[in-house]
Amino acid sequence: MNYLNENIDSLNKKLASGDLSADKLAKDTVANIKDTDKKLNAWITVVDDAKPAENLDFSKSKLAGIPIAIKDNIITNGIKTTAASHMLYNYMPMYDATVISKLKKAGATFVGKTNMDEFAMGSSTEHSYYGVTHNPWNLDKVPGGSSGGSAAAVAGGQVVAALGSDTGGSIRQPAAFNGIFGIKPTYGRVSRWGLIAFGSSLDQIGVMTKRVKDSAEVLNVIAGGDEHDSTVSTREVPDFTKFIGQDVKGLRVAVPKEYMEAVSGEMREVIQKQIDALKDAGAIINEVSLPHTKYVVPDYYIIASSEASSNLQRYDGIRYGYRAEDTKSLLDVYVKSRSEGFGAEVKRRIMLGSFALSAGSYDRFFRQAAKVRTLICNDFDKIFAENDVIVGPTTTEPAFDIGSEISDPIKMYNNDILTISANLAGIPAASVPAGLVDGMPVGLQVMAKRFDEGNVFKTADFIERTNKFYEKTPTGMED
C-alpha cells in the first residue's frame, strides 16, 4: 500500500465502504515499508504482524484502522523503544505513552517505530545508532531531525500520519525538508507522559502528515488532559478540523523582518509568494520585529542541554540502560556504560549542560538564559496583542547533503534558529510546504498564541489549498 496519493479521509471512505479491509491495509502497509525502506532507512522497528483492533467503527473514528508511525522516543507497550540509542538498544516497554493509549482507543494501527537523532538531539537524523535516514526528495540529502524518520515515512508514502516530538524544531524542520505538514502544539496541549525526556520545559509531542486536515484529525485524538502529566492543560480541546477550509479575510498576519532576512533570495521569493497569497485573500500583513532572535540559539542550547544532562543522569548502567562489560568497580560501570552507550552528540550536550549547571557557572549561564527566555516570550506576547499569526520561513535553507554539516556542531545548531523560539515561548507552531528551491522542498512556518492551534490550522490549510504542494511526488521515490 503506497500512500503518496492517499489521506485519512480517502482511506476512511474505503474502509467504511468495505472496498478495503483494515487487516489488508495493515499487511500492505508493512509490505510497502519493507520494500521502500531499502531506500530511506526511515524505520528502526517494523511490526511484521501488525494487526488492527477488533470491532472498529469507521463512522465514529476517522483513525479506525489507519496505520500510524511512531517516533522511537515515544513509549509503546510490547514494541521496542530505543530513542535511536545504543543505551536503550533492547528496551521493551511494559506500558503505553498516553498518546498511544488515546490512539489505540481511536482504533489506530501501529506498524512500527521511526528513526531519529539519538535521544532527539540533532537536526539531520545522522546521530542515530541505526544509521542515517535519507530524504525522499533526494536520497543524498538529510531528512532533517530529530524526527527525520517520521517525516521521511510520510513524505515517502509509507504512512499517512506519524507522531514526532519537537524540542527546538524537531517536527517543523524535517517537515519543511520533506515537503509535508508538521505541527508542534502548545506546550501542555498534549501529554508528555511516556515521551523519553530531553528538555522537559521544551518537549512536545506533535503530528506529521502530508495534508493539513490529517494532522487536525490526529491532534483531535491525542490532545487533552492526563492525570499522569501535571504540565498538561485540562482546558477543552476544540475540533481542529473545523478550522479547515476557513476564509483568511481579515486575518492579521505578522512577518518578522529577522526571519525574512535570514534566508536566501530564491528562498525568500518562495516564502514571499505565500505571504502575497494571504494578502490577496484579504489577510492583513504587518511587518514586525522579534529583536531577541539573535539570542535564541545560545539561549536554547544552554537551557535544553542543562535539562538533558539532568534527564539523562538515570542512564548509568545500574538504574537504566546499557551496562558495559569487563568493569572493575562501580565507577567503572558508570563511566564505561555511559561512554559506550551514548553517541558523540548526546555526550557533547550532557557536558555542555553539566557545565552550565555547575556551581561556578549556574549564575553566569543558566540563570541568564532563563532571563533571556522571558524576554523572548515577551516579544511574542507583544506581537500577538495585535496579530493573529506569525509567518515566515521554517528554515534558513533546504535540506543539505548527508555528511556535510555533521562535523560542525555550531553550523548544525544554527539550523534551528527560526524554530527554537516557539519552544522557548511554548506557543503552537507548524510548517506547511511553500514550494521548491533547487528541487528541494522549503516550508512556511506558522505560529500563534498559546492554545490557538486553530489559527495555525486555518492559515496552513489556506496555503495548502493555494499551492497544492501535496500533488507533487518526491523525486527520490520515482522508479
UniProtKB/Swiss-Prot annotation:
Q: Which GO terms describe its biological process?
A: translation
Q: Which superkingdom, per the lineage?
A: Bacteria
One of the record's GO cellular component terms: glutamyl-tRNA(Gln) amidotransferase complex
Residue positions of the active site: 71, 146, 170
Which Pfam families is this protein grouped with?
A: Amidase
Keywords, alphabetical: ATP-binding, Ligase, Nucleotide-binding, Protein biosynthesis
Catalyses which reaction(s): L-glutamyl-tRNA(Gln) + L-glutamine + ATP + H2O = L-glutaminyl-tRNA(Gln) + L-glutamate + ADP + phosphate + H(+)
EC number, as in UniProt: 6.3.5.7
Q: Which InterPro entries match?
A: Amidase, Amidase_CS, Amidase_dom, AS_sf, GatA
* Top-rank EC class of the record's enzyme: ligase
Q: Which family does it belong to?
A: Belongs to the amidase family. GatA subfamily.
Give a short account of what the protein does: Allows the formation of correctly charged Gln-tRNA(Gln) through the transamidation of misacylated Glu-tRNA(Gln) in organisms which lack glutaminyl-tRNA synthetase. The reaction takes place in the presence of glutamine and ATP through an activated gamma-phospho-Glu-tRNA(Gln).
Q: How does it assemble?
A: Heterotrimer of A, B and C subunits.
Against NCBIfam families, the record matches this protein to: gatA
Name of the protein this chain belongs to: Glutamyl-tRNA(Gln) amidotransferase subunit A
